[in-house]
């Protein structure tokens, strides 16, 4: 059993996207182009890997042997909104189709490897992510505030009364779905079941970053972005 557990842990996959909206440009951090007319104002420093990065990231420089910098990416999208959509989905905006974000696609493809998950597989901290597109609302991002709070998730009823209401609702929805009301009704039922699991799951403790020791909060950064990174960990 222990060997199987270790093997499962190795095979589990996840991805973290740090979306630095409004952050510094690439020529100020990753690709300084020293000596070039298009270069940035900062000096490059050597790292633990092969690349040089900005002088203002000495701690990141120590981890560059674990990193890969992609400098060949380009786009013709000049509008920020369209560019953001492109970066989150891999597709240029098209009025005829709504593409799913990377988080929705990864969740859809890898969910069978994460059977132990009681929380949604796609989480966005602070909102702002692109939605599930044509994959449907069952793969929509679960939004958590940077302090770990989730709106409307606290149980306002005693357990017995809540489960009685959920059982009655499930009966009504099954009748609704049996009338072939479409995918939206089935997705709604799935989301309700996930919500109930969330309200009772111990895995929700992962979002309570304010319970972390002060030194851990300071290490990640005791701010919205740092807390988001800590949750992702």
Where is each model-derived feature located?
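Ligand-binding pockets and gating/stacking loops
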Residues: 1-233
């Amino acid at each position: 059993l222990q060997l199987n557990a270790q093997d499962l842990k190795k095979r589990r996959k996840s991805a973290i996207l740090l979306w630095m909206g409004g952050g510094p440009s690439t020529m100020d951090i990753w690709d300084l182009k020293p000596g070039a007319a298009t270069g940035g104002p900062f000096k490059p420093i050597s790292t633990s890997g092969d690349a040089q990065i900005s002088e203002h990231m000495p701690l990141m420089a120590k981890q560059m042997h674990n990193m890969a910098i992609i400098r060949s990416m380009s786009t013709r999208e000049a509008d920020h909104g369209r560019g953001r959509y492109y970066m989150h989905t891999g597709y240029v905006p098209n009025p005829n189709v709504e593409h799913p974000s990377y988080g929705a696609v990864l969740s859809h493809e890898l969910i069978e490897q994460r059977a132990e998950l009681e929380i949604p597989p796609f989480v966005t901290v602070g909102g702002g992510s692109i939605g599930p597109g044509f994959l449907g609302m069952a793969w929509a991002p679960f939004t958590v505030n940077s302090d770990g709070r989730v709106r409307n998730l606290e149980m306002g009823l005693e357990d017995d009364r809540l489960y009685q209401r959920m059982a009655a609702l499930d009966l009504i929805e099954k009748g609704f779905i049996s009338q072939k009301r479409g995918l939206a009704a089935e997705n709604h039922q799935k989301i309700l079941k996930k919500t109930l699991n969330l309200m009772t799951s111990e895995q929700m403790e992962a979002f309570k970053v304010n319970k972390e020791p002060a030194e851990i909060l300071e290490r990640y950064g005791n701010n919205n972005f740092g807390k988001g990174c800590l949750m992702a960990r």
